[in-house]
């Protein structure tokens, strides 16, 4: 999902802006001056992170852009180090997933259940860290990015780089389920608290 697609769901986007601390208006689905002001603050923080940590490949940039600016900083800091490490290992690394709206999450949840296909998630809309602009997943590829490695011992190697970033959790430290490609900003102690806060706006 791109940031443009997220913005089309105006109420969801307003909640994202409010969660980031920029939007002080009502969640009404109407783009007004308060939302415009919040979007400017979002873009300013986004630009600052790019200046500090640099920019990357198109796919990673597309997914980073969907995260809260504070999470974008984490993603950029981690990816800068991860790309250097991946290169030494003879691989390429990219961020392949960022924020999902509740609607997109529900569609993924339906796959392998009410819709054809293999199951890809156990979380409905509002029950995934990806629904709040806080989490991203990365993928490991061949140097030319023509081959994707869904399984590799290097997920652990690269994922561990996130452990040293303050207020960050790497899914490889989880017990059930272990999620080595997953990294998130620790804004809330549980996904329940994240959902409750997000929905309360």
Segment roles from a protein language model:
Residues 1-4, 24-27, 63-74, 144-152:
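Second-shell loop/turn segments in exported
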Residues 2-41, 46-54:
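Short acidic, glycine/serine/threonine-rich helix-capping segments at coil-helix boundaries
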Residues 16, 20, 78-89, 157-168:
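Generic non-transmembrane alpha-helical segments
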Residues 26-27, 90-99, 168-177:
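Surface-exposed patches in mature extracellular/periplasmic domains of secreted proteins
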Residues 30-34, 95-108:
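Acidic helix-start/capping segments at beta-turn-to-alpha-helix junctions
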Residues 56-97:
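Active-site acidic/histidine clusters and adjacent loop/turn architecture
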Residues 108-122:
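Short, surface-exposed loop/helix-turn segments at secondary-structure junctions
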Residues 119, 123-201:
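Catalytic cores and adjacent binding grooves of peptidoglycan-active enzymes
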């Amino acid at each position: 999902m791109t940031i443009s697609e997220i913005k089309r769901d105006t109420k969801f986007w307003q909640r994202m802006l409010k969660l980031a601390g920029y939007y002080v208006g009502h969640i009404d689905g109407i783009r007004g001056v308060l939302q415009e002001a919040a979007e400017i603050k979002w873009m300013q923080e986004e630009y600052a992170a790019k200046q500090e940590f640099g920019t990357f490949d198109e796919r990673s940039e597309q997914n980073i852009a969907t995260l809260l600016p504070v999470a974008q900083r984490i993603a950029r800091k981690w990816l800068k180090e991860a790309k250097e490490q991946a290169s030494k290992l003879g691989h390429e690394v990219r961020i392949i997933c960022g924020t999902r709206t509740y609607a997109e999450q529900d569609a993924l949840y339906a796959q392998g259940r009410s819709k054809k296909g293999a199951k890809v998630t156990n979380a409905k809309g509002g029950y995934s860290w990806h629904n709040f602009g806080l989490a991203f997943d990365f993928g490991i590829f061949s140097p030319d990015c023509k081959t994707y490695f869904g399984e590799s011992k290097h997920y652990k190697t690269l994922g561990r780089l996130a452990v040293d970033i303050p207020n960050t959790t790497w899914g490889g430290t989880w017990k059930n389920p272990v999620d080595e490609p997953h990294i998130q900003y620790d804004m809330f102690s549980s996904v329940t608290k994240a959902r409750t806060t997000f929905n309360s706006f």
